[in-house]
């Protein structure tokens, strides 16, 4: 699982490298912590044990939680990709991922749909 300080570091590096407004949204560090607890709750209480599902839950919790002043979608996506990489699953960062994250943040794509997307991209990358 990704810890609070690691997620904040990911966000800060994104802001440093790509620009944007630094800092936390209204709930401060507690907002980030709450988003991470949502992921942990899905794992522990809902029995979520699929790598793609957990990664997608990170993306959704951070992007929809608007826990930072800026770069929530980028941070959510990077956390999802990082989680998968830590589990030995590396998927290419395709151009449509950023558009997909807009739909994730707006509620147009569920965590289940995002997990299916991650799985499909990974499976395609394995056949190359």
Positions of predicted regions on the chain:
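FIC/Doc superfamily catalytic core
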Residues: 1-128
